[in-house]
């Protein structure tokens, strides 16, 4: 066992050879490396599988012994300062390593097929492997300096993957938005690290916790300054985990490929903020007010994320706001001091959300058959519907993830979310009411996504939902370029090559470039109905994409058992996290009162079923061929006057669809102010700074010209200069001014 911990330092570096070899290969042998690009998926998956096996071994040992191991290498620069680097193995590290590796492997297997026809295949796998390396380095770090280094590397990888299709303006803007927003949090994190180093003189977690605890108990540190430093540390987690008010980058990050959305939302970037707060929780507990602040930010994010997801039409943006809300639950649990329930929900949510995002990728992949490679259309739930008949395996897996996130037993998220909801009553009744209400909203918007996607009829063939079929086709490449081409509707077989692809629903022409996926075999199959109209339909994804859905579906079914006690013994998660922090349950019993548990659980399940019922009532098409796409459609009156209720619903829809106008507020206030400041700075630089510099140059020129004539060797110039000086002297002597 000791040897296992001694060699744990290699965990972050095992996936690193893949991006290094890809970079060297592209530099020295670019043609051969590109021709053999598909082979790089195997070493990426293999190396991450080795880390997963190692992490499983560590986790088993942690469950059996609950030991904490830390190894440190010290580099002494002088007698007063030394740099220490090392790694820390504890229950939190083993849990995060398991999440990163298991979800990462599933995403890599999925991506091999999803990204097979993309020209950036090599760049994608290099970035993904380096992403795994950075995240594994973050969770094994033993001090704040290492945390910050890997924190920045995780951010860098996420920016590279969010802006993966950088020729698309929306993707480039999303990358910049994520970068700028996270700069705010990262700057606060850096200031907080420096502040605590100034207080304690150490970056090591153990030393930091012990010294700060002693200082606070003896009242040797300014509490206001300590609270400020803790709030700055928390700012980094707020930005990384998309908590209010630094959440605005998360929905725009959906411009990246769907597999990276799954990895970011399940086990890497947004989980990094939760990990940081969990790692520093012993520090936050001893500082006044900071725990209340964490729970306050968490509950706001819970409610805001759920309400913003209500009216989204983009399937990935809806799931993104769902992630934001669920991360708010985790942050709320950490702020309440319920360490176990926060990590439990982190585990269950990771597998459920990875399943949902990979399922959405399969849906998008199938919709691209019809609408082309246009994210505005392939991700638009308005154009979907009736996919249950065409992608049954994807539908079943997506339904599992949806029910899990809704909190339906016995799926994973039911067990973890129910713990957080019950703990919220012990912490604050107001927070509990908001948390329980949001549980109903979660069930509503998740089933709304499911119903709009899989139930009813395929709506892409109809324009404005009135039954009018579009006749022209258009295409748009994966890189944002497109080409218009009219195609005979009676063709039974359509094929796509490098420069042509086809789609329904738009009359807008696009010009096609060369960056289009190559696909072998028929592109569209046109089915003739009785009215002799031509249609095409989605198809199920390949087995390589369905296998990760199967594995994640099984995990979603059974991972909740980690937190269920059997035979009056401690559950696996409690053994795993022993000793852990739990401020709400100071006297934790080994046994559980199942009667009390099911009594509390029945209320949360009832709320979830109520949300599902409302969503089914509003969005499931029963009598009409088309579902009601907007929340207000059932309440719109034909008369000239609209009731107050209609106006409220319309305002709620607009508020949700427009992201609560927070982005608009930032644009008008912060962006406008920064632009105005930049213009003032530009004017000052050009007119004042450059004016002084240019003025000195012009003055030097004229002075030089004057000296040149004085000392030019001409007697007349000397006499003129001499007589002028004498005249000025005499005038000053005989006609004094004062």
UniProtKB/Swiss-Prot annotation:
List, alphabetically, the GO terms of the cellular component aspect. Answer: chloroplast thylakoid membrane
Q: Which gene encodes it?
A: ndhF
Report keywords, A-Z: Chloroplast, Membrane, NAD, NADP, Plastid, Plastoquinone, Quinone, Thylakoid, Translocase, Transmembrane, Transmembrane helix, Transport
Q: Which reaction does it catalyse?
A: a plastoquinone + NADH + (n+1) H(+)(in) = a plastoquinol + NAD(+) + n H(+)(out); a plastoquinone + NADPH + (n+1) H(+)(in) = a plastoquinol + NADP(+) + n H(+)(out)
What quaternary arrangement does the UniProt entry report? NDH is composed of at least 16 different subunits, 5 of which are encoded in the nucleus.
Q: Which organism is it from?
A: Ligustrum vulgare (Common privet)
Please report the name of this protein according to its UniProt entry: NAD(P)H-quinone oxidoreductase subunit 5, chloroplastic
Subcellular localization: Plastid, Chloroplast thylakoid membrane
InterPro entries on file: NADH_UbQ_OxRdtase_chlpt_su5_C, NADHpl_OxRdtase_5_subgr, ND/Mrp_TM, NU5C-like, Proton_antipo_N
Which GO terms of the molecular function aspect are on file? NADH dehydrogenase (ubiquinone) activity; quinone binding
Among the record's GO biological process terms, what is one?
electron transport coupled proton transport
| Role summary | NDH shuttles electrons from NAD(P)H:plastoquinone, via FMN and iron-sulfur (Fe-S) centers, to quinones in the photosynthetic chain and possibly in a chloroplast respiratory chain. The immediate electron acceptor for the enzyme in this species is believed to be plastoquinone. Couples the redox reaction to proton translocation, and thus conserves the redox energy in a proton gradient.
Which segments cross the bilayer? 9-29, 40-60, 89-109, 125-145, 147-167, 185-205, 230-250, 258-278, 280-300, 327-347, 354-374, 396-416, 425-445, 546-566, 603-623, 718-738
Superkingdom of this protein's organism: Eukaryota
Topology relative to the lipid bilayer, per the entry, is: Multi-pass membrane protein
Give any Pfam family that matches: Proton_antipo_N
According to the entry, what is the taxonomic lineage of the organism? Eukaryota, Viridiplantae, Streptophyta, Embryophyta, Tracheophyta
State the similarity comment. Answer: Belongs to the complex I subunit 5 family.
The EC code for this enzyme is 7.1.1.-
